[in-house]
Amino acid sequence: MKSRTLWIAVFVGIIALGLGAAVVAAFVTDNGERSVSGTSTGSSSVADTFALPLGLESDTLALAKHRRDLLVGLAARPGGPVEVATVRGDTPLSGDAVRVAVDGRVVPAEPCGVGCSRVQAPVLQGRPSRLTVRAGSMPVSFRLPATLPASGGSELDRARRTMGALRSYRFTERLTSGGPVVFTRLNVQAPDRLSLRTNSGFRSVIIGHKRWDYQDGRWQGGPFPGLAVREVLMWYAARNPRILRRLPNGDVELAAYGLKPVPAWFRLTVKPSGRVVEAQMTAPAHFMLHRYGSFDRAPAIEPPQ
């Protein structure tokens, strides 16, 4: 597997996907070695992988799924159109490689940019619809609700305020590009401390403008651009959230789309308190699941000895 597919946990949210004007991209190779390269905000190749003109429109629903390394994401407007982005790994698929069906009927598609196909279909207009996208032998289906779900703007705003105000928390990350999986455990402490450890044994500690990585049997320190812990929350800049459902315990499930840290679809489960307990990010070759806990109870993060 290419080393770039093993983006380490926090470096997805803070380093590899951009922090400030100058950041560091950290990758892990198959044999556990680490390479570092400089980048700048918004320079990730993911940003140029696909187009989705409807993605940021306020009257749309954005959903995404993946099967192995195939990503299929959409943005649907009541009454149509529906735009579908299809990317295999980092490669956008042309329109002639994609077939779209609504309620079992193949509908004609027109291009709407790189890797993007637009279809006219009377979705979100009073009855549920099933949209199926087929790229080769891989069908990916979505059940669209009868109407456009209610805005989840207030719920997402509450989640931003609540999670951004925490003194500390823990989360786990499951990251894959469609093949092998990297698991990472992270501790976060406001305002600027973070520690992580992957299932391969890689460890790192960040405190302010200092960073330590465990390499060759010892801790090695170096400078770091600095971080604000809210930027660890990869969903923080998501846009146009929609309420997919309200659970009996009061939790709310949201779907959203955004351009930061890269163009991606997001799914969040938000407690009535505003605490996020689970979040997914679906972007080309980067399929992540975060689970949060130990709110204001995570251990203090200190420089490694």
Regions found by a protein language model. Give the residues of each.
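Intrinsically disordered, low-complexity terminal tails/loops enriched in metal-binding residues
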Residues: 3-158
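An acidic-aromatic
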Residues: 178-235, 287-289
